[in-house]
Amino acid sequence: MNFREELILRCASRRRQKLGQMSDAAYEELLLAVRQNPEAYIDSDAERAFSLLGQAMRKFNESARDDDLLDDDQYMAARNKRFEALRGACQAALSVDADCLDAQLLLTLATVGRPDKLLDALCEIEEKCADEPAFEQLDWGNPWDRARLRLRAAISRTCADCACWKMALETANSVLEVTESAGDPLGARNTAALAYARLEDEEGLNALEARFTQGNAWTSLARCLLLYKLERIPAARRSLRGFAQLNQGAAYAMMRPVFVEVYLPDRPDYAPGCFEEAMAAVHEAEVIIADTPDFVAWCQAQTWFEADARAYAEKHDLDW
């Protein structure tokens, strides 16, 4: 999530609303002015609180840059420290604007660890939004609507973590219906793809993929899992090869899954086909993989797959 860009859009849209009639050309001029110095256009508690969150997340991300150089104890100490700082920043933002939904979301994600407890907490936050416009009336193009969409996307991912697959699919599709025209900025189709795989709904996965011109690590892995679960092994083998070929280090990500930090507040914007995307897809699919007997062993039994994983580890000096 780009907090600064969204702050710019929020400030510009609010100023446009205050000024009344404004042509598109005039709005573009306003947008350029706000982009130069967005802080100068902050004139509401909602914007001030959101700005505080942006500053906090920038510090949070900067503090994690050297994590790879730390041993386990040092890493946990540094992680605990930055999460504590983030929780404090969320509380500060809420003291400015108690209705700041992004602060509520971030605070909950940074505080509640157990997926079942997290799901309850997120659903409780969403219930408080019931008196606002109906969810299907939201618009990603309106920056003030995005917080509710992020919240619903977080609920969908947490449903998947809890193995509540029907609810995960329903909530993911509700987000996708609103955001698909904007290119699915929250990656709702990724959660939906995994849900279709777990529910063994090939028709649903086919229809989902047909809506987009390009697949990704999630859809490739979902396809492979689905075919394996349906015992269509030759087709599953071809899908596994596609997953490995389309995503850097995908075989290594599968064979040596690593810790993936909680998404704050939404899934990072990975470069298509990068190793980080493959890691995230495997991480999000762990609940399905654990519930699919012998899947990892079957992957490992493909000699080319293990060779790919080993070669990637050697090339990038990773543990094997």
Regions found by a protein language model. Give the residues of each.
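Long, ordered, amphipathic alpha-helical scaffolds
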Residues: K59, L225-W320
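TPR/TPR-like (Sel1-like) alpha-helical repeat modules
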Residues: L119-A130, L176-V178, A210-A217, L227-Y252
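Residue-level recognition of tetratricopeptide repeat
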Residues: R48, L86, V96-A103, A182-P185, ...
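Extreme N-terminal leader/anchor segments
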Residues: M1-G88, A92-S95, L240-F243, E306-W320
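Flexible helix-coil transition and linker loops at the boundaries of alpha-helical arrays
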Residues: P38-D43, C90-D97, A121-D145, E177-P185
